[in-house]
C-alpha cells in the first residue's frame, strides 16, 4: 500500500508532516509513503533512510491564501497537485494534505475524480464526544448548498465509513435540525427526514440538535455544508474558550493552583478525549480513492493518525463499498 503525502501543506510543514510519516512507517509494516514537495527541504528533515519512503520533487506550493480553483489549474507542479496525480494515475492508493482546504477539494474532485453515482462529495471530520468514541459530521463545507438526495448520500457514505473504519456495527444516523420533532426544520430537512426514514440500509434515528452532538447522540450526523461548517467552527471555538477559561481559573490564586496540581492527571485525560488529532483528518467522501484533509495546525501526531485513517480506508476498500451502496440505493428508488 502506498499513500502520497503533501509535505509542504500545513502550518508546521514540512517537519511535522515528515515526523508523522516516519511514525506511520514505523507503525505499519505494509505501508509505503511518497512525500511530495521540495526535495532538498524534505531530505534535510528526514531522520531515516527507510526504503519505504520516496520523495517526489515539486517546484511549487499552493499557499493558504491562494484561490483554490485558480491555484490547482495554474500550479501544475505544486506538491498538492502532484500528490493528487499520484492517486489518479494509480501510483498511490490514497493522499493526505494539511494545506489549502479548497484547493484540496478541487484537486480531489477534478484530478482524483468522483465516484459514479455520487452527486456531491462531502467533507467529513470525526469529532470528539464525552465518551471518547466520537461522531462523524458531514458535510462541513464541500458544498454550501445541498438537496435532500445529497444528504441521503452523505448518510450512506458516513454509514459505510463508520462501519468499516470506526468499527461501528450499525451506525446511528441523525439529521441535524433545530428540534427533535419529526416536522421540525426547513424544507430541506423535512424532505430529507422523510427520505431517510424510508431508506432501508440506513439506521436513521431522526432529528438531532447541535447541543446534543458531544453527548454521543449519533454516530453519523448529516447536514448541508453551510450549517456543518458553522457547527464545526462553533464546537472548535467553544472548546478552545472553555479550556482557556479553565486555565485562567486554575492559575488565578495559590489555592486554585494547588487544586490544579491535584487535578492535572484528570484534566489531561479530559483534554485527550477532546483532542481532534487522535481522530485523524477530514475525509473527502465520494471520490474514487481516499483523500484526507489534515487540520492546518497538525502536529506529527495528527499526521500519523491521518495516515492510520487513510490506511484503514484503503484496507477496507471504503471507496468501492460506497459506490456499491449508492448504486444499490439508486436501484431501489
From Swiss-Prot:
Pfam families tied to this protein: FA_synthesis
**Known InterPro entries for this protein?**
FA_synthesis, Phospholipid_synth_PlsX-like
Q: Where are the transmembrane segments?
A: none
Per the record, the major location class is: cytoplasm
Q: Cite the GO molecular-function annotations of the record.
A: phosphate:acyl-[acyl carrier protein] acyltransferase activity
> What is the E.C. number?
2.3.1.274
Supply the alphabetized keyword list.
Cytoplasm, Lipid biosynthesis, Lipid metabolism, Phospholipid biosynthesis, Phospholipid metabolism, Transferase
**Listed GO biological process terms:** fatty acid biosynthetic process; phospholipid biosynthetic process
Q: Which reaction does it catalyse?
A: a fatty acyl-[ACP] + phosphate = an acyl phosphate + holo-[ACP]
Q: Name one GO cellular component term.
A: cytoplasm
The pathway entry for this protein reads as:
Lipid metabolism; phospholipid metabolism
Cellular location(s): Cytoplasm
Which SUPFAM superfamilies does the UniProt entry name for this protein?
Isocitrate/Isopropylmalate dehydrogenase-like (SSF53659)
Q: How does it assemble?
A: Homodimer. Probably interacts with PlsY.
Give the protein's biological function.
Answer: Catalyzes the reversible formation of acyl-phosphate (acyl-PO(4)) from acyl-[acyl-carrier-protein] (acyl-ACP). This enzyme utilizes acyl-ACP as fatty acyl donor, but not acyl-CoA.
Matching entries from NCBIfam families are given as: plsX
State what protein this is by name: Phosphate acyltransferase
Amino acid at each position: 500500500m502506498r499513500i502520497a503525502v503533501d509535505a509542504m501543506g500545513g502550518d508546521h510543514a514540512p517537519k511535522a508532516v515528515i515526523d508523522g510519516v516516519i511514525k506511520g512507517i514505523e507503525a505499519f509494516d505494509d505501508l509505503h509513503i511518497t512525500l511530495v514537495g521540495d526535495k532538498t527541504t524534505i531530505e534535510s528533515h528526514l531522520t531515516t533512510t527507510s526504503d519505504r519512503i520516496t520523495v517526489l520533487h515539486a517546484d511549487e506550493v499552493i499557499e493558504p491564501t491562494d484561490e483554490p480553483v485558480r491555484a490547482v489549474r495554474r500550479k501544475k507542479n505544486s506538491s498538492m497537485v502532484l500528490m493528487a496525480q499520484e492517486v489518479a494515475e494509480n501510483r498511490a492508493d490514497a493522499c493526505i494534505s494539511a494545506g489549502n482546504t479548497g484547493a484540496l477539494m478541487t484537486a480531489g474532485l477534478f484530478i482524483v475524480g468522483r465516484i459514479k453515482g455520487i452527486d456531491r462529495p462531502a467533507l467529513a471530520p470525526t469529532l470528539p464526544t464525552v465518551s471518547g468514541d466520537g461522531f462523524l459530521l458531514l458535510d462541513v463545507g464541500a458544498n454550501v448548498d445541498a438537496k435532500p438526495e445529497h444528504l441521503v448520500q452523505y448518510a450512506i457514505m458516513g454509514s459505510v465509513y463508520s462501519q468499516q473504519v470506526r468499527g461501528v456495527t450499525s451506525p446511528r444516523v441523525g439529521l441535524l435540525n433545530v428540534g427533535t420533532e419529526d416536522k421540525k426544520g426547513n424544507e430541506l430537512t423535512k424532505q430529507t427526514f422523510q427520505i431517510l426514514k424510508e431508506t432501508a440500509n440506513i439506521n436513521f434515528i431522526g432529528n438531532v440538535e447541535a447541543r446534543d452532538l458531544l453527548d454521543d447522540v449519533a454516530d453519523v450526523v448529516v447536514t448541508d455544508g453551510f450549517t456543518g461548517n458553522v457547527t464545526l467552527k462553533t464546537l472548535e471555538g467553544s472548546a478552545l474558550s472553555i479550556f482557556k477559561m479553565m486555565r485562567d481559573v486554575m492559575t488565578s490564586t495559590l489555592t486554585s493552583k494547588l487544586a490544579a496540581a491535584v487535578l492535572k492527571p484528570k484534566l489531561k485525560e479530559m483534554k485527550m478525549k477532546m483532542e481532534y488529532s487522535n481522530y485523524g483528518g477530514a475525509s473527502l467522501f465520494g471520490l474514487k480513492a481516499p483523500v484526507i484533509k489534515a487540520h492546518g495546525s497538525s502536529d506529527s501526531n495528527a499526521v500519523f493518525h491521518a495516515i492510520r485513517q487513510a490506511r484503514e480506508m484503503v484496507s477496507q476498500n471504503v471507496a468501492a463499498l460506497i459506490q456499491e451502496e449508492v448504486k444499490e440505493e439508486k436501484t431501489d428508488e
